[in-house]
């Protein structure tokens, strides 16, 4: 008897859960099947405009009924559609871009979601030292010109006496060796690589150097100035008050 009671209680619980799940699914389907109504503001100056509006919405995305009011420039659309904005965009695309939604009120801020700005890390500048055989100045020029054409390379410094090439730029040194073999057809061997700091760190170091230097004062030497000396008019004939003896 006890086992039968437990089995009966478990069956009742399962039936209640199924009923709840069924009710929730029915509620969701009812919400989707509910008839909605939206009011659009569309400028219509004649019956032809009204027929164009109703023609572009007829049978679109669950639209069932369309009512146009030319005097008030309103279009009332009712039906079982999911998104009212689709109806508005349909009218803007097919009839007029100046169409607006009166009800339900729409918040444009919800659509204009600002994309998350990803912080771009400063690219790492690397310096790779490669071993390459260079027989003459022509080989040196060809290697330098060929490596400079590779994307991300900033500077190339070949040294014929040591058979080395110092390459600086934003790159992956092992891949650079493969590109040199494919494009130039020359053997290259990676000896060492150095990763430099980003641009931001360089700016900080420069600011520290400027602060340590302090304020500099520059003094300019005096300039040569020549003044024109006018002749004395004390004893001239034009001076009435000059000495008569003189």
Curated annotation (Swiss-Prot):
GO-annotated molecular function: metal ion binding
Cysteine methyl ester, modified sites: 243
Binding site residues for a metal cation 2: 136, 139
Segments for region (Disordered): 1-31, 96-122, 191-226
Keywords: Lipoprotein, Metal-binding, Methylation, Prenylation, Repeat
Start and end residues of each HMA domain: 35-99, 125-189
Lipid sites, type S-farnesyl cysteine: 243
Propiece span(s): 244-246
Family matches, as CDD domains: HMA (cd00371)
Residues noted as binding a metal cation 1 in the record, renumbered to the chain: 46, 49
Function: Heavy-metal-binding protein.
Recorded family membership: Belongs to the HIPP family.
Name of the protein in question: Heavy metal-associated isoprenylated plant protein 8
Organism: Arabidopsis thaliana
Gene that produces this protein: HIPP08
